[in-house]
Structure formats: structure tokens, C-alpha cells
Amino acid sequence: MELETVLQSFQSVRQLLQYTSKNTSGFWRYLFGSTLSKVVNRVKEDYREEFENILADCPGLLASLDLCYHLVFQEKVVRSLDFSSVGRTVASIAFLATILDKWSEKSHLSWDYMLDYMSMQLWRAWLKRRVCIYSLARPLTMPPLPTLQEEKEEERNPAVVEK
């Protein structure tokens, strides 16, 4: 799936957030953007009011980001990103793109720093969730390995295959 391959690489995550931000024109996005960037941008536009209401519930988030105090962002936003389905993953990306747009409006920090920071947080959250899913899918204990005595016994008395 295109979404999973995009989220596997930091560069592609950065490019996705760049193409979904307001700094990229619609014409540029139309010509050079991927289908995923167009979908995420559409979701960002459709749910703009809901995303702004969520941001209004976290006063001081953008100010703390502007002061490079990222603990509030980590606790409030990154922990709540949901990658359980394709739709929720796209909504999470659109929400981060909305935060990036709002942050860049009033910040003194460079655009590249803000883009890199948001891309890194999205990429790390995705990788962390994938590792957690894979670790839950693995068995908790390894099967017991045969002891040296059992191996010697098998060598002396090989199992007879019956026909």
C-alpha cells in the first residue's frame, strides 16, 4: 500500500507534509504531488473546523512549540496519533499538517526546522506503533531449545519413519 511505503522513509514523510501544507500551491500539488498528498490535503480542508476546535482545547501548544519546548506536543498530540486504520492514519497526518500550518503563521523559526520537526515526530510515531504491533504479534516466550542430552539421544536413536 502506498501509505505504508510513504511512512517508512523520513524523506517521503517530509515530502508528504510539505505537499499538504499551505506553503505548497494547489497547482504545484496537482502537478507534482502524490495521490496521498492530495487526499491528506482534502481531509485537512474538510475537517479544518474540527482540527481548530481540538487545537483550541490545547492552549499554549503553539507557543510552547515556538519556544522549542516540545513536551506538551509530545504528551498531547504525538501520543494521541492513531494509526489503527488507513482513515485514521490519514486523519492523523492531516491534523499534523494543520498544526504545521498554524505554527508557521506566527513563528520566528525557519520553515525547514518546523517541517523537519513535524516530519520526524510523525515518522517516529509511525515506527514506534509498528514496532509495538509486531512485538505484540510475537509469542511472549521462545519455544524451549533441546538440551544437549536430548540431542545426543536423538543421534543415537533416530526416529524411525513408518510407511
Swiss-Prot record:
Pfam family membership, one: Adeno_E1B_19K
Subcellular location, principal: host cell
Biological-process GO terms, alphabetical: symbiont-mediated suppression of host apoptosis
Superkingdom per UniProt: Viruses
Disulfide bonds: none
Compartment annotation: Host cell membrane; Host nucleus envelope; Host nucleus lamina
GO cellular component, one term: membrane
Keywords assigned: Apoptosis, Early protein, Host cell membrane, Host membrane, Host nucleus, Host-virus interaction, Inhibition of host apoptosis by viral BCL2-like protein, Membrane, Modulation of host cell apoptosis by virus
InterPro entries documented for this protein: Adenovir_t-Ag_E1B_19kDa, Bcl2-like
Role description: Putative adenovirus Bcl-2 homolog that inhibits apoptosis induced by TNF or FAS pathways, as well as p53-mediated apoptosis. Without E1B 19K function, virus production is compromised because of premature death of host cell. Interacts with Bax protein in cell lysates.
Family: Belongs to the adenoviridae E1B 19 kDa protein family.
Protein's recorded name: E1B protein, small T-antigen
Lineage: Viruses, Varidnaviria, Bamfordvirae, Preplasmiviricota, Tectiliviricetes
